[in-house]
Amino acid sequence: MDLIKYFTFSMIIFILGIWGILLNRRNILIMLMSIELMLLAVNLNFLVFSVSLDDMMGQVFALLVLTVAAAESAIGLAIFVITFRVRGTIAVEFINSIQG
């Protein structure tokens, strides 16, 4: 198992996630997908180093991150649906003006 290949692949995925956030500042849904891409890269790092070090803690952390990411996505998508129903858009400019 070549760690450099997996680490490079994970780094590319993480950079693509950062790039997606920085390039697209208007659509909040694409920003959420980019954050999920970054979490995927972190999970891949946890799993690769867990297998290479013969330690189960990396796999446990990866499962923990997956469950938190699933909950985050569900809550975020629910907020987006409610915002779209009330305002008619999920653009970042209009979400920033929400008060209350």
Curated annotation (Swiss-Prot):
Give the UniProt keywords, A-Z.
Electron transport, Membrane, Mitochondrion, NAD, Respiratory chain, Translocase, Transmembrane, Transmembrane helix, Transport, Ubiquinone
What cellular component terms from Gene Ontology apply here?
Answer: mitochondrial membrane; NADH dehydrogenase complex
Query: Please, which domain of life does this record's source organism belong to?
Result: Eukaryota
What broad class describes the main subcellular location of this protein? mitochondrion
The UniProt GO MF terms for this protein read:
NADH dehydrogenase (ubiquinone) activity
Q: Where in the cell is it found?
A: Mitochondrion membrane
Classification via Gene3D superfamilies: 1.10.287.3510
In its UniProt record, which GO terms are filed under biological process? ATP synthesis coupled electron transport
Q: Where are the transmembrane segments?
A: 3-23, 28-48, 62-82
What the entry lists under InterPro entries is as follows: NADH_UbQ_OxRdtase_chain4L/K (IPR001133), NUOK/Mnh_C1-like (IPR039428)
Q: Membrane topology for this entry?
A: Multi-pass membrane protein
EC number in record: 7.1.1.2
**Is the keyword Nucleotidyltransferase in the record?**
no
Write down the chemical reaction(s) this protein catalyses: a ubiquinone + NADH + 5 H(+)(in) = a ubiquinol + NAD(+) + 4 H(+)(out)
The record's subunit annotation is: Complex I is composed of at least 49 different subunits.
Give the function comment from the record.
Answer: Core subunit of the mitochondrial membrane respiratory chain NADH dehydrogenase (Complex I) that is believed to belong to the minimal assembly required for catalysis. Complex I functions in the transfer of electrons from NADH to the respiratory chain. The immediate electron acceptor for the enzyme is believed to be ubiquinone.
- Family as reported in the entry's similarity comment: Belongs to the complex I subunit 4L family.
User: HAMAP family in the record, alphabetically?
Assistant: NDH1_NuoK
- The name this protein goes by in its record: NADH-ubiquinone oxidoreductase chain 4L
Which organism is this entry from? Arabidopsis thaliana
